[in-house]
Amino acid sequence: MNQNKCTGSESPLGLTRRNFLNRFGGGLGGLALANMLHAESGTGLHHPAKAKRVIYLFQSGGPSQIDLFDHKPRLTKETGKELPDSIRKGQRLTGMSGNQASLPLVGSPFKFSQHGKSGQWISELLPNTAKIADDMCIVNSMYTEAINHGPGVTFMQTGSQLPGRPSMGAWLSYGLGSLNENLPDFVTLVTKNKSGQPLVSRLWGSGFLPGKHAGTRFQSNKDAILYLNRPDGVSRGSRRSVLDGLKELHKIQLERTGDEALETRIAQYEMGFRMQSSIPDVTDISKEPKSTFDLYGEDAKNPGTFAANCLQARRLAEKDVRFIQLYHQGWDQHGNLPGGIKKQCKETDRASYALVHDLKQRGLLDDTLVIWGGEFGRTNYCQGKFNSSNFGRDHHPRNFSTWFAGGGVKP
């Protein structure tokens, strides 16, 4: 059966509008996808959604909501006391803290204050993010069933804890198509030199969708995409002739076999040819004015840093790339949380603010949805031996924070 010809609930993919959203809506992709589908459905809604593209700043490891966005003054007062049995009962705990004889509560050692007209509570660790409080919707009631990193990250990227499903960027590419035929619909950037749970390519893969919808990972070296540049002595015209010949051969084979993978291969060859001209224009930041680096920081000049990737995300958004996925590892603080989370915030706070501010000043924030968050949160009790100034927090799937900005989102 040709699955592309199936419609309605009888499709093995369930690709009616309703079934599609129901099946994929488990992860954050459901929010982004529903928003964008409404924007292009042409149904004459009274308040049509605005988002045309998504920038997802994924913080891998599970940032501590208690120390960043979810202000808990009562918890601070109760620091050192035992987690009540009434709360602990029935809670799923990891093997790292589930066998502890004691689970002492520990509040945040960091100060919180309210910001903007919206009065949103934000930690002192995020002074720059606090400047965009009135552009953000902070959701402190996020919930997941996953308690370990692999299933948790997979769920947030695909809507399923099991591997093999299409990622949200792949779904958007498949469902909405391209806004710029000279660039991929879906681009992934990973902060270099970070440690933590491995980030595998299936997180930006296409699953059972055609391979052309998978994310294209940009490298942090001078060649953003491996093997894209033409070899010395090969002209653009000769490369065009070779591709035309390959295209004809693939068409003959496609007619004989009906193998849809051949269509994907043809599309990828054509995209690669076009990107030989379009990619240098996107990745070359040499013409960015001084004001850009005053905003993002000097770290934005260093390829592969979170700041550089945020700047790259803005440039890709300007070129109408549909889905731009950033990954930043290092949030898994089972120990030494006070020191570790400070380092993470120093790396990400300024650039996250700069990206939202930059999109806004360029008129791009209204139709770009920015998402910041991880796969789960952290516990309100101490992992390991209690020390109020040097402690860790275990994984906590039942409560974590994510913020959204742009695309019509309001505080």
Could you say what each language-model-derived stretch is?
Residues 2-411:
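Ligand-binding pockets and gating/stacking loops
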